[in-house]
Structures are given as C-alpha cells and as structure tokens.
C-alpha cells in the first residue's frame, strides 16, 4: 500500500528518485500514465496488469470504454527504476502534468501520484473543505 507525501525533484534528464520505502514494491517494474486532474499515476506492474484485465472485460462497444482506454494506454510508459532508485518520466507525461523541478509524490493506496508541487498545493487547499464534507458520503458510518 502506498501512503504519504514526498517532495522529490526532477533532474535535467527528467528523472526522479522514488521514495525509498516504495522501491521494493516497484523494483520489478512500473507503469507511468496520465491520471486525473493533471497528475501522473504510477502503478506497480502487477496492479497495472490487474487494471488491464478490468478494462479488457469492459465492453468495447461502449464509447466511454474505448475513449478512456485509448488515452490511458496510449500515454502509458513501462519504466524500470535504475540502481539508484531513479525513474525516468517521459517528456510527454512531464508536459501533461506540468512537471518542472519541484514535484510531489503522494501515496494513493494502490498507486503513486506525481504532481507539480504548486498544482498539488492548490489542489490540496481547494479540497480540504470538500474532504471534510465528503467523509460521511464516501465512508458512511466508518469515521
């Protein structure tokens, strides 16, 4: 499970150090792809394969399934962390997420998300009130 917030930096080659506590889970490979709200999703290869199976079972006759699958898979990039724990973020994905030097990596249960630092700060500030309001709707009777 991926938890927490980290602030790695992109180097001039578009590489970033993955947080050390996640490296074992990602050592076998990972997939980086477009996420919602202009962030990037980082999946361990097994989780990406599970999602692939779910999408494979969805009806290709449904336009929404075709549209989502095209964007999701066309932007996906298989990556393997180097010996130092760095992963390269492809230029097209850096551009999509507006990534420059300062980034934020958040744990989001089964995936990591990579955000531009300012975009994340803005999103988090905007969502703080919504977070409080949605607790009962999202987790009824739990919290």
Swiss-Prot record:
Main location: cytoplasm
Localization: Cytoplasm, Nucleoid
Keyword terms: Cytoplasm, DNA-binding, Repeat, Transcription, Transcription regulation
Domain SpoVT-AbrB: 5-47, 76-119
TM regions (residue ranges): none
Domain of life the protein comes from: Bacteria
GO CC annotations on file: cytoplasm; nucleoid
Stated family: Belongs to the MraZ family.
Full protein name: Transcriptional regulator MraZ
Species name: Thermobifida fusca (strain YX)
Name of the encoding gene: mraZ
């Amino acid at each position: 499970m991926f938890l927490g917030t980290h602030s790695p930096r992109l180097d001039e080659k578009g590489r970033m150090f993955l947080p050390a506590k996640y490296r074992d889970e990602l050592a076998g490979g990972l997939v980086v792809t477009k996420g919602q709200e202009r962030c990037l999703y980082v999946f361990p290869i097994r989780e990406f394969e599970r999602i692939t199976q779910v999408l494979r079972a969805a009806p290709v006759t449904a336009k929404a399934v075709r549209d989502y699958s095209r964007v999701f898979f066309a932007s996906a990039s298989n990556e393997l962390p180097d010996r130092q724990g760095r992963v390269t973020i492809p230029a097209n994905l850096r551009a999509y997420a507006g990534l420059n030097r300062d980034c934020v990596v958040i744990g989001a249960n089964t995936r990591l998300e990579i955000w531009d630092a300012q975009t994340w700060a803005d999103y988090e500030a905007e969502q703080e009130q919504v977070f409080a309001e949605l607790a009962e709707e999202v987790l009824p009777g739990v919290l």
